[in-house]
From Swiss-Prot:
A motif (PTAP/PSAP motif) lies at residues 111-114. The record marks Y131, P132, F215, P216 as: Cleavage. It comes from the Viruses. The lineage of its organism: Viruses, Riboviria, Pararnavirae, Artverviricota, Revtraviricetes. This protein is probably translated as a Gag-Mos polyprotein. Gene3D superfamilies: Gamma-retroviral matrix domain, Human Immunodeficiency Virus Type 1 Capsid Protein. A lipid is attached at G2 (N-myristoyl glycine). This is Gag polyprotein. Residues 111-222, 434-455 are annotated as: Disordered.
Length: 468
């Protein structure tokens, strides 16, 4: 028992059913092999200190998440479901993760407590001698007379909950009279989700948050969910910085999937998102494939119109996002929409495209395998994760690897019984033992010199007789 070493990565693999359940709660699906690849091969290259064996350090997870969610070509939309699930494991750990969670995150919450005593000084300026003119204005009471004469509108504005916009540390020199009246009336309102979207790249993420702060559905200061639609700048940036669905369905599908996960949009938001990023024909194809993915009570795909319309309606449903039932409907709807995007993005079988995927000179075998699997998903109807397709993927991996790696893989003993994982490990070993460019130049130079020595003409000794 004491000889086995448990790492965060091995721990998640031992509890893979729980990991899949947690991912499902985040409205995403994760695959075990991609989980291992991203943790051990991809995220360590982000230069944030991510170990190859994984970690539950929340700071490192947040740094990797920032890299994954980076806009434009520097982002990794295909890795969003995996880092979101890692984050959920660390911030809301199940019992088998709690012993491994770093105890460092609680201290970042402490600075927020000392910030509370900063509020009383805000109420002192009205009593300060620096503002003597404010005292008579309060005693004269001109405002109550105006409010009573004007009737309801202004009274309603003052009695309603304040809008959810944060006053970011206002200087005490301006409008202290207004803040002095608003502060005792209630607590400071929550920050605006719309402002949070605009500040997202400047402010670090909150330590106790498990997901992105850019939510259309957000709990406001009165404890009720508040709705914030997509901004036009968000939609414009998503459309202009990504290829069309017909050109690269995988990339746009990954983008929409990440938006559905982080923003948790309503039914109307989903229609707006699809209408902006897809053409009319592409949208109809996605909706058709999503309705095909609806399953009945027996867990199998159903074609009953009432069940299909109940799960994936084409007309605006009466799902209230303020109720748990309405939110459950929206989660299921978004899952079906992701399935529709994935199925609609599959092109007709084109094995020539798959054969055209070859390993780059400096590309790791793990990264090459991911590109190869993506080609299978995009250009064939086959699932590369299906055990029945492992032989085909293995042969493609051998034949399309770099020449030096492919030759050594073909010479392996008992090649027929080697699994794809065995081939990848052997390819990684060969890749890591490759000679550097300097070593290669030195070897070529030595071989050239040896060849010249072997082919140099052997001249007989000439004895010169010099006569006196």
């Amino acid at each position: 028992m004491g000889q086995t070493v448990t790492t965060p990565l091995s721990l998640t693999l031992d509890h893979w059913k729980d990991v899949e359940r947690i991912a499902h709660n985040q409205s995403v699906d994760v695959k075990k092999r991609r989980w291992v690849t991203f943790c051990s091969a991809e995220w360590p290259t982000f230069n944030v200190g991510w170990p190859r064996d994984g970690t539950f350090n929340r700071d490192l997870i947040t740094q990797v998440k920032i890299k994954v969610f980076s806009p434009g070509p520097h982002g990794h939309p295909d890795q969003v479901p995996y880092i979101v699930t890692w984050e959920a494991l660390a911030f809301d750990p199940p019992p088998w993760v709690k012993p491994f969670v770093h105890p460092k995150p609680p201290p970042p919450l402490l600075p927020s407590a000392p910030s509370l005593p900063l509020e009383p000084p805000l109420s002192t300026p009205p009593q300060s001698s620096l503002y003597p003119a404010l005292t008579p204005s309060l005693g004269a009471k001109p405002k109550p007379q105006v409010l009573s004469d004007s009737g309801g509108p202004l009274i309603d504005l003052l009695t309603e909950d304040p809008p959810p916009y944060r006053d970011p540390r206002p200087p005490p020199s301006d409008r202290d009279g207004d803040s002095g009246e608003a502060t005792p009336a209630g607590e400071a309102p929550d920050p605006s989700p719309m402002a949070s979207r605009l500040r997202g790249r400047r402010e670090p993420p909150v330590a106790d948050s498990t997901t992105s702060q850019a939510f259309p559905l957000r709990t406001g200061g009165n404890g009720q969910l508040q709705y914030w639609p997509f901004s036009s700048s968000d939609l414009y940036n998503w459309k202009s910085n990504n290829p069309s669905f017909s050109e690269d369905p995988g990339k746009l599908t990954a983008l929409i999937e990440s938006v559905l996960i982080t923003h948790q949009p309503t039914w109307d938001d989903c229609q707006q998102l699809l209408g902006t990023l897809l053409t009319g024909e592409e949208k109809q194809r996605v909706l058709l494939e999503a309705r095909k993915a609806v399953r009945g009570d027996d867990g199998r795909p159903t074609q009953l119109p009432n069940e299909v319309d109940a799960a994936f309606p084409l007309e605006r449903p009466d799902w209230e996002y303020t109720t748990q039932a309405g939110r459950n409907h929206l989660v299921h709807y978004r899952q079906l929409l992701i399935a529709g995007l994935q199925n609609a993005g599959r092109s007709p079988t084109n094995l020539a495209k798959v054969k055209g995927i070859t390993q780059g000179p400096n590309e790791s075998p793990s990264a090459f395998l991911e590109r190869l699997k993506e080609a299978y998903r995009r250009y064939t109807p086959y699932d590369p994760e299906d055990p029945g397709q492992e032989t085909n993927v293995s042969m493609s991996f051998i034949w399309q690897s770099a020449p030096d790696i492919g030759r050594k893989l073909e010479r392996l003993e008992d090649l027929r019984n080697k699994t794809l994982g065995d081939l990848v490990r052997e390819a990684e070993r060969i890749f890591n033992k490759r000679e550097t460019p300097e070593e290669r130049e030195e070897r070529i130079r030595r071989e050239r010199e040896e060849k010249e020595e072997r082919h140099a003409p052997k001249l007989p000794w000439l004895f010169l007789i010099i006569s006196p």
